[in-house]
Amino acid sequence: KNQNIYVKEVATGKEKQLSLDGTLGNYYSAYIRWSPDSKKVASCKIRPVEKRYVYYVESSPADQLQPKFHKQEYAKPGDELPFKVPCIYEVESGRSIIPSTELFDRQYEVYGPEWNPDSRAVTFEYNQRGHQVYRVLELSAETGKVRPLVEETSDTYVNYTRHFRHDLKDGKQMIWMSERDNWNHLYMYNRITAQPDYQITKGEWYVREVLRVDEDNRQIYFSANGMEAGEDPYLIRYYRIGFDGKGLTCLTPEEGMHRAWFSGDMKYLVDVYSMVDKVPVAVLRSARDGKVVMPLETADITLLEAEGWKAPEVFVAKGRDGKTDMWGLIARPTNFGPNKKYPVIEYIYQGPGDQYVPKTFRPYDWNM
């Protein structure tokens, strides 16, 4: 309260103020984390920014003759951003640990902090403005020093929206996702040495998402694309692999775009898969080896086909470099005549941000 951090003794209701310098212009966050040993708390001190506005005139409003003047809150490129400084307070002594900001001073965002299991440090993540540097940092509760556990750098862009981190319970290792070898893969990181012990997944394919980390059985369940040779690299399948990088198992072996839901005990998964020219199929599978336990449903498109519907044709052609496979669709009119000539409408997105070519079955698509 009052922009500061307080603790209250539950039994007596007695309050103790830990921080003394919080103000409206530099306040302590309500994001507060107790250490596992209950002797310390961690939070962030935040320096907010003033609201920024743009102004514009509505020349012809519907309800009056005179123009209207509008003001809208709107941050612009280059504007100052809020600044966060992770901090630690010892509850009994009131000692504060406020670190140097050298390793996280050009902030786009700071995430955390979260306590390490041994209560000796907190871990937080730093996303540098411009997205060319991303760090996992550790703040010592004893010395107040900050050290990097992981650092990702790029001359272009660090894809922070795709990153994944899982700290193992022993506090000695963590699983980290990185594009450092030009593919998105998982690494086992040593938190003591701040170096990767080894790469868990590797190859010319892309880890999409980690669904579950099973520490007891040392297994990772994840989705990926591009692993199967000769297939559209955007088709997603599900896999599991051991912490040691061994025992890679495909849990959804049929060609197609898969979407899976795992049971709470990770023994089974419901898998729904299709392609633009193959109807959706739903099955129950074993999460150990991917074998089908029970078929659930297969879509019936008899009525759709009776109306003349035809599936689009999947094609692959080389890109302008003569090497890269480009996957696309050819959608023909329902009354297509093979002996007629038709104009070709090319609908593409050339940017790097996403892919828009449909991969799953659909009876119609506004793009086609």
Where are these regions (language model features)?
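Beta-propeller fold detector
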Residues: 15-20, 97-100, 146-151, 197-202, ...
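Serine-hydrolase catalytic core recognition
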Residues: 112, 119, 125, 250-252, ...
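Beta-propeller domains
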Residues: 49, 53, 61-196, 208
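Predominantly five- to eight-bladed beta-propeller fold
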Residues: 18-33, 43-100, 288-304, 356-365
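Short glycine-/Asp-/Thr-/Trp-enriched loop segments that recur within the blades
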Residues: 23-30, 104-110, 154-162, 203-210, ...
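Short coil turn/linker residues within repeat-based beta-strand modules
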Residues: 12-14, 93, 143-145, 193-195, ...
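A conserved hydrophobic secondary-structure block that centers on an alpha-helix together
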Residues: 1-25, 106, 111
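Beta-strand C-termini and the immediately following turn/loop, strongest in propeller blades
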Residues: 1-4, 9, 42-48, 76-80, ...
